[in-house]
Regions:
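Right-handed parallel beta-helix
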Residues: 280-291, 314, 334-348, 357-372, ...
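Asp-box/WD-like beta-propeller blade repeats and closely related beta-sheet repeat scaffolds
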Residues: 380-381
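Extracellular polysaccharide-degrading/modifying enzymes targeting complex plant/algal/animal polysaccharides
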Residues: 4-5, 9-332, 337, 623, ...
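Predominantly extracellular beta-rich ligand-binding scaffolds that present long acidic/polar faces
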Residues: 59-72, 77, 508-651
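Extracellular beta-strand solenoid repeats
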Residues: 50, 57, 63, 74, ...
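Repetitive beta-strand solenoid architecture
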Residues: 4, 45, 52, 58, ...
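Beta-propeller domains
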Residues: 205-215, 224, 251-277, 290-292, ...
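Short glycine/acidic-rich loop motifs that flank beta-strands on beta-rich extracellular proteins
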Residues: 60-61, 266, 293-299, 325, ...
Length: 682
């Protein structure tokens, strides 16, 4: 049992300004406990703060600095809530057209962007009610040119189909929302010219206003339209001029009994050390952190692959919502932890580990209803600045993410080494489950020796974004291993619904003993990279093949051996339209087991590998010709008897032992996949 030099007690109801921190006279609030420790303890003393059940509402973020080190904040109860929300009261009825709305005053010093009713996130008004509008034209954008050739031709102005956009009241509060490529742009309207059907926005899009590879202009919708209020129950609108929230009640809701909460903070917890004096040994256990809002920030471009300007306000970060803040933020913090907590109803990421964050354990938490992603780790791009490493991100449930920023990732690790990312359950997101690395191409970087294992990642994408992976890797990462993960249900928009994605420059990575299935394009894709090892995996039922290759290079791109590859009417290893031909890619492939459950098995094929033409047939290539290239000369074609797990993970995975023995394949043991019970917990 750990002993502490100082022991304090906090209570929201029994505490008072005159409390001394004893169990009989607890302090009132977490800030009071922090300040009492600053005044009382001498250097080197450790402390524990027992926090009684109740609601602790913050008016400003709770901040910690180096002098607050060596402290454990322990929730003594099942419902210790730290909240940044304000409950709106005194609702009145307001008739609007044929509808009766409810109205309540909101804080005048906030631009309210989020509303939660009885603990559920409510949507702002939007147009159209169903589906999406489409950009009519963007000056200077030639759709006949390739999507990547024109990718960075962003704009703040575009033409629309007459009637799609109107001269709305509070026009500058209306936002154009554009999901395309792998991001979602958010562009507040500046002005509308109805005579020319042209709209100009206050921000510029990062990418050209096209629907990436589909050959069409981008889709979009409008959000926060006052004129749409009253059309759908449960929607709401913030009248910024009157500082009022207008809400359309759902059937059965009563003003006297429902609870509506608006966040008044963007962050709840800020743990900020200094580069030469970090916060150390600071721990939080058993809390629920809830209610933060989001804002349109100045977009940072530090991780952009180029062609963007720091002088322009853009509608999105270039990838993965990297500019979004965390409700709980750690910077220059070491040897600390967040354990057995809940983070919910937040506008950005749940947890951010920023520069100089090392040896932090984020374990056994539930992160849900997130505007952004679950955990975002960001270190310095070189070992000399802001190095972050050796963090433990395990046993977390990360669910319902990307509700504001759909390009956010379940667990994002940038410029960081030696991290353990394991036993997490990540699902119901719109973009990648886990993303790691973050140096484009073959440039030097600090990412290495990251272990990604025993994660259950499923039901992500939802057809919203393109170019995603259940596990996404970027850049040279020696020592990084992706193993024993269960990944399935990856659904992209136009292209790139992959279970494992080795993007630009991914090199010296081992992908082994994973079970990957049900991908809207392929189970594995290597854009380009060097000397990766893909072994002893199950890849099954990619809609457009099982493994996609994109770029031919002079070196060996990857080694593919002792894998089970099961398709349903499509070739296994594919390339072609818009990508390299499989014969042109230098790879080592052998001792694999191939089977097609619907058609003659084809080891390789060519054709369109994206999802824009699902009925277009991929052309099988001759197995003899494939083998003549030196590939799969000892591989086997035959029914593997594959059984995949059902929705409750029962009934699999398994393969025929006899078939597996022919190639030396050993079925991955995934019995421990997903979060484990905490020691001492049931």
């Amino acid at each position: 049992m750990t002993t502490f030099d100082i022991e304090l007690y906090v209570s929201p109801g029994d505490g008072s300004a005159g409390g001394d921190g004893s169990s009989e006279r607890p302090l009132a609030g977490l800030e009071a406990a922090r300040d009492e420790l600053r005044a009382r303890r001498t250097p080197g003393q450790s402390a524990v703060v027992h926090v009684a059940a109740g609601h602790y509402r913050l008016e400003t973020p709770l901040t910690f600095e180096p002098s607050d080190s060596a402290t454990t904040y322990l929730a003594d109860g099942h419902d210790v809530r730290v909240e940044g929300g304000l409950v709106l009261r005194y609702w009145t009825e307001v008739p609007v057209g044929d509808a009766v709305l409810w109205a309540a005053d909101a804080p005048a010093d906030r631009h309210i962007r989020s509303l939660f009713v009885d603990g559920e996130r409510r949507a702002r008004t939007r147009r159209p009610r169903e589906g999406l509008f489409r950009v009519a034209h963007q000056d200077g954008l030639d759709l006949m040119r390739g999507s990547h050739e024109t990718q960075y031709q962003g704009s703040d102005t575009f033409g629309f189909t007459p009637g799609d956009i109107e001269a709305y009241d509070a026009l500058r509060d209306v936002e154009v929302v554009v999901p395309h490529y792998w991001i979602q742009e958010r562009l507040p309207i500046a002005e509308v010219d109805l005579a020319t059907s042209t709209v100009r926005c206050a921000r510029r899009s990062v990418f050209a206003l096209r629907d990436d590879i589909s050959g069409s202009f981008a889709n979009y919708y409008l959000e926060n339209v006052r004129e749409a209020l009253g059309e759908v129950a449960g929607e709401w609108y913030y009248d910024r001029a009157a500082h009022r929230v207008l809400y359309v009640p759902r059937p059965g809701e009563r003003r006297e009994t429902f609870t509506a909460t608006v966040p008044v903070l963007d962050e709840l917890l800020l743990v900020h050390g200094e580069e030469d004096r970090p916060v150390t040994d600071l721990h939080f256990e058993g809390f629920t952190f809830a209610y933060t809002d989001w804002s349109l920030q100045r977009r940072t471009l530090s991780d952009s692959p180029g062609r963007l300007s720091d002088e322009i306000a853009y509608g999105s970060a270039p990838q993965a919502a990297t500019d979004v803040t965390g409700a709980l933020e750690f910077r220059h913090t070491t040897d600390s932890s967040l354990v057995n907590c809940v983070v919910e109803h937040v506008g950005g990421h749940a947890v951010s580990l920023e520069a100089g964050s090392s040896r932090i354990a984020v374990t056994h938490n539930t992160l849900r209803d997130l505007g952004g992603g679950g955990i975002a780790v960001t270190g310095g791009a070189s070992e000399a600045t802001g190095l972050s490493r050796d963090n433990v991100l395990t046993d977390n449930e990360i669910v319902t993410g990307g509700r504001v920023f759909p390009a956010a990732v379940g667990i994002l690790v940038r410029h960081s080494a030696g991290n353990t990312i394991s036993h997490n359950h990540i699902h119901d997101l719109h973009y990648s489950g886990i993303s790691c690395g973050w140096t484009w191409g073959y440039r030097d970087g600090v990412a290495r020796d990251n272990v990604i294992e025993y994660n259950h990642i499923h039901d992500i994408g939802h057809g919203t974004m393109s170019d995603m992976g259940g596990v996404y890797l970027l850049g040279v990462q020696p020592g990084t291993v992706v193993r024993r993960n269960l990944i399935h249900g990856i659904q992209c928009a136009n292209y790139g619904g992959w279970c494992v994605y080795l993007d630009e420059g991914s090199s010296h990575i081992v992908v082994e003993e994973n079970v990957c299935f049900d991908a809207s394009t392929q189970c594995l894709h290597q854009h380009y990279g060097r000397e990766n090892t893909i072994r002893n995996n199950v890849f099954a039922f990619g809609a457009r093949g099982l493994i996609a290759v994109t770029r031919a290079e002079e070196h060996v791109s990857f080694t593919l051996e002792r894998n089970v590859l099961v398709s349903a009417g499509v070739p296994a290893i594919v390339g072609g339209t818009g990508a390299a031909h499989p014969y042109d890619v230098r790879l080592i492939s052998d001792l694999n087991l191939f089977w097609d459950t619907r058609a003659d098995t084809a080891m390789s094929g060519e054709g369109r590998v994206d999802a824009t033409a699902p009925d277009e047939v991929l052309t099988p290539l001759s197995d003899d010709a494939w083998r003549a290239q030196g590939h799969d000369r000892h591989s086997v074609i035959g029914d593997v008897g594959l059984v995949l797990p059902g929705p409750d993970r029962a009934g699999g995975p398994s393969v025929s032992r006899e078939r597996a023995a022919e190639i030396g394949f050993v079925m991955p043991d995934l019995t421990g996949v997903g979060p484990r019970s905490r020691p001492g917990k049931q």
